[in-house]
Amino acid sequence: MKSRQDIQKLFSTWCRRICSISSLLAPLDATMHKYDKKTLIRIYNPKKIGDTLQRCVKLLGHFKENPAYINTEQCWLCNFAARRHSRKNIRVSRMRAKRKYQ
């Protein structure tokens, strides 16, 4: 079992990697929104955090839609989408996210 620090390190590495791929922002801040690393770590298997983030970025496309919110809201969006696998629910979560952060 990985320690909490290892998991957080893994998570922030993935965040940075995704950010650099999207080339929209500098690496994520260490201080995040209240829906942050802990939420993802609690819900997902640590080994799959990277997959979850990649999958959510692809499905939601929120790096393109909400560039201003990547630093603070990205984890909440990922978390919201990854827990709901059907297309309908992903669409709903995208609408909710847009409404909440307009």
From Swiss-Prot:
GO terms for biological process: cellular bud site selection; filamentous growth. It comes from the Eukaryota. Partially overlaps BUD7. This is Putative uncharacterized protein YOR300W. The lineage of its organism: Eukaryota, Fungi, Dikarya, Ascomycota, Saccharomycotina.
